[in-house]
């Protein structure tokens, strides 16, 4: 699973547009 933690609290609505921290668990 891929988990993306955006730097901005509202960024979840704009994930394709922001630079997010991405964590890959279990590939």
UniProtKB/Swiss-Prot annotation:
Binds 1 Mn(2+) ion per subunit. Its cofactor is Mn(2+). The keyword Oxidoreductase applies. It catalyses: 2 superoxide + 2 H(+) = H2O2 + O2. Keywords: Manganese, Metal-binding, Oxidoreductase. The keyword Manganese applies. It comes from the Bacteria. GO terms for molecular function: metal ion binding; superoxide dismutase activity. Its EC number is 1.15.1.1. Homodimer. Destroys superoxide anion radicals which are normally produced within the cells and which are toxic to biological systems. Belongs to the iron/manganese superoxide dismutase family. This is Superoxide dismutase [Mn]. It comes from Desulfovibrio desulfuricans. The lineage of its organism: Bacteria, Pseudomonadati, Thermodesulfobacteriota, Desulfovibrionia, Desulfovibrionales.
């Amino acid at each position: 699973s891929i988990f993306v933690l955006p730097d901005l609290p509202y960024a979840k609505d704009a994930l394709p547009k922001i630079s997010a921290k991405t964590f890959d668990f279990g590939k």
